[in-house]
Structure formats: structure tokens, C-alpha cells
């Protein structure tokens, strides 16, 4: 069977009912991505300065595919006689070991291979604890609004503070939620400190659909537009999702063709969810499993989830009250009264939750338990 595009090479993959050869499939996928990056075309570049974009790299198949496509675009601009590239690319890696210590062996040497494959980009690898350096407000937020007495033990390191905070949540959903907040705050703060024009998030349509369902389930529906939609974020930096028109399965096929030399460093997922007990499965895990299994049967339905969010009106951010934890304008969902409130968390303990939190963060903070380490 011949490819329906070039009508010459034999077809090797079926994409959305179309039989394509390897080259035509790669061109199809890359075109989808580049159309989502029209904002950053060379002809739209400012004359007086060079734009800079941040690409957070998780070593997953989606962010690696995005890195390959964007790096290839910039290389083509450099080698075709053009005097400049459309932008400079700064790749940010939050050290996987600082998030999941069990990944230590798998993470070894991966950045060196990435630099060898794409040497023209700028690279930074930072641990999660560097959030204290880039986001000076985070220390006060942890101390003042979660009850962890940081000031009583000044000898405690940033890593100890962060580990204590993350370990204080009693459920897998709360831990995953707070890790997501910390990661976003770190990436945004890092990008702003380096005067970047935007962030290229490597989220596929499948990932965005799972995030949408998970955020609604967690009570974060009011902030959906800033989690899955392109545009200016409340933090004065542009969010771009170049992979939003592509399914995770399509990116996996693309990686098998275009990233043959990097297959060994790609984080393989999904995890075997059947081996996880309910206690260790977060809402994010559950929604990812649902989208991956049902998306194979009904891809159009999964795509409509993200398209529906695109139709939502972006809430105004001027003079909006900001949640002290996730820093999202919460509007009417924010209880701005002074003081704090008492409630019963999922662990059965009475928990003090600051009133200046949005509904989603309030639910997460209710799952906090008392710190188990010595407070000094």
C-alpha cells in the first residue's frame, strides 16, 4: 500500500485514517507543531532584540519530540543563510532526582546526550529546591500559610524545608497537586528571571485532556484556561502549547522514527496502573489512565475536551485576588477574609486552612498532616 500523500513510498503508519510513509508522517506531525508556533516566526521577530523561549524538558516522549522539532527549525534557519534565528531556545530541566529520588540511576548522563544531539541551545538543570532562589515568596507561603515553623530552625536547609513540606500531605492526589504547583512556580519564576518571552510547554492533546479532567475533579475549574490554553498567563509570560493538536500515541510513533538515537533516555510511561493501590493512585494517575485507554477508542472525544476549554472566557486578572499558594486569580472562589478556618481533612485530622486560598488549594491543604520531623 502506497502513501496517500507522496503516492510513491510504501505506507508504514496509519494516522487518522490516512496511510502515510515515514517521511510524510514526520512532515505531517512537524507541520502541526510549527503551525502552533506562528507567533514566533522569524518574520514576526522584533528588530531590536532577540527573543528567548523556555522549553521545560521532562525527558518524556512529548517534551523530547518538541525539543527535536524546535531545534531542527532553528538549525535550518542557521544553515540556510539567514542572519538570525527566530528566537533563542533555553532548555530547562528540573532535576528528576529532586522530585523522585528513585530515578537517580535512570537520569544519569541524559543531559549530556541531549546537549550532544542539540548543541546550539542553552541548557540549565536545577533541583526543585532552587524555587527558593527564583521565587522569593515561596518560603513565606510555606511558613505562613501551612503552619510549618521554618523560622524556629534557621539551620534547616532549603532541601529539608521542601521535603518536609511535600511529605506533609497525606494523599497521593494532594502530593501530586502540590508538586505541580511547585514545578509551575519554579518554571515561571526561572523564565521571568531570564527575561524570556514565553514558555513552550510539551503537553500533547492527551496530556491536556487528562489535566483538564483532573483539575475539574480537584476543584480547579476556574484556572483551567491557564493550564491548557495558549495566551498570556497571569504571571506576565506567554504560554504556548505547540503539541496540543497531537495525540500521545502519534508522538510515540514520531519518536520511534525521528529520535532513534535517543530512545534509551526517554522516560517510559504510563506506569502499570493495575499494580497501584487506590491509596497510591492520584487523580492525575487515574485521569491519565482513562485518557490513554479511552483515547485509543474515541480520539475525537478526547480532543473535544481540550477544544471545549478553549471556548471558555479567560477571567480578568487586573485587580484580581490571587491565591497565596498557586498564585492563580481565583475570583469569586477566593475567600479573602482575614484569618483562617478550621476543617476536617481526608485524614480525619482538624486542619487550619488560610482563607486567602482558592477552592482547589483549600482542598489540597486539608490533606496536610503535622510535620513528622523535628521542628527545631
Swiss-Prot record:
Alphabetical keyword list: Cytoplasm, tRNA processing
Q: What is this protein called?
A: Cytoplasmic tRNA 2-thiolation protein 2
The compartments listed are: Cytoplasm
Q: Name one GO cellular component term.
A: cytosol
Pathway(s) served:
tRNA modification; 5-methoxycarbonylmethyl-2-thiouridine-tRNA biosynthesis
- Where is the signal peptide, in residue numbers? none
Q: Which SUPFAM superfamilies match?
A: Adenine nucleotide alpha hydrolases-like
State the similarity comment. Answer: Belongs to the CTU2/NCS2 family.
Q: Which GO terms describe its biological process?
A: protein urmylation; tRNA thio-modification; tRNA wobble position uridine thiolation; tRNA wobble uridine modification
Taxonomic lineage from the root? Eukaryota, Fungi, Dikarya, Ascomycota, Pezizomycotina
What GO molecular functions are on record for this protein?
A: nucleotidyltransferase activity; sulfurtransferase activity; tRNA binding
Q: Outline what the protein does.
A: Plays a central role in 2-thiolation of mcm(5)S(2)U at tRNA wobble positions of tRNA(Lys), tRNA(Glu) and tRNA(Gln). May act by forming a heterodimer with NCS6 that ligates sulfur from thiocarboxylated URM1 onto the uridine of tRNAs at wobble position. Prior mcm(5) tRNA modification by the elongator complex is required for 2-thiolation. May also be involved in protein urmylation.
